[in-house]
Amino acid sequence: MTGNEHPIGVFDSGVGGLSVLREIRAVLPHENLLYVADSGHLPYGNKPAEYIEQRALTVGRFLLSRGAKAIVVACNTATAAAITVMRAEFRVPVIGMEPGLKPAVALSKSLVVGVLATEGTLKSAKFRDLVGRTTEKVEVIAQACPGWVEQVERGDLGSPATRDLVRRYTEPALERGADTLVLGCTHYPFLAGLIADVAGPDVHIVETGSAVARHLRRRLEADGLLTRRMAPGVELFWSSGPAEVAGRSLAVLWPGVHRVRPLPAGFAAGD
């Protein structure tokens, strides 16, 4: 197998990164994709940065062992904690996530932008640096959203409990004048409809999965790594948590999944 026929590896703390995988599949229909849900260590957002870094390196090594020609860190928290060390260790392109503050600032007329993200992302030096670089004239309201990741992991995208959680953590930024909301966690696009219901039609909602997918395509093209196959690509899925639990969530978020493989023990265990 030549280098450009190898698969692309994608991972997240759970199933949230499927929102990014969906965008990758849309722009790279012929590529084979590997996806790891690190559900045995979910959520990343409330864990120490050192722990997340070790998990990201471990999952990255697994993807490389499966022949990945590039790795997408489809998790804002893991990007903030681990992208630098991953790029230093791995000799393949490593693409990360960051909240879409730059497009949000361009869209905002009230000059108030809300960022909905995990505690780990909002407390990271990477996020503070991003705010400092892009929001000189804009007020940024950083709002952690505990419970959102867990609801998405359960495949619970519309129950009264989920609606209440979404309202609880969306309204504070709106009450302070935000006219643009940034979804700073890859789980949150699965709640975008509920967020829009709370925010109303005049509030912009910014997510970055499509931008990351386009960046990945450009990088693969520049490095000569795009597949030459014309057949549709396939997806393979692993989970470090109970595979049957991940399978139920995947059935809701990625219809057509037939199998979720357990991550091998050497990669699934904590560090």
From Swiss-Prot:
Key word Lyase present: no
Keywords of this entry: Cell shape, Cell wall biogenesis/degradation, Isomerase, Peptidoglycan synthesis
Keyword check for Transcription: no
Catalytic activity: L-glutamate = D-glutamate
Biological role stated in the UniProt entry: Provides the (R)-glutamate required for cell wall biosynthesis.
Family under the similarity heading: Belongs to the aspartate/glutamate racemases family.
Name listed for the protein in its UniProt record: Glutamate racemase
Gene name in the database record: murI
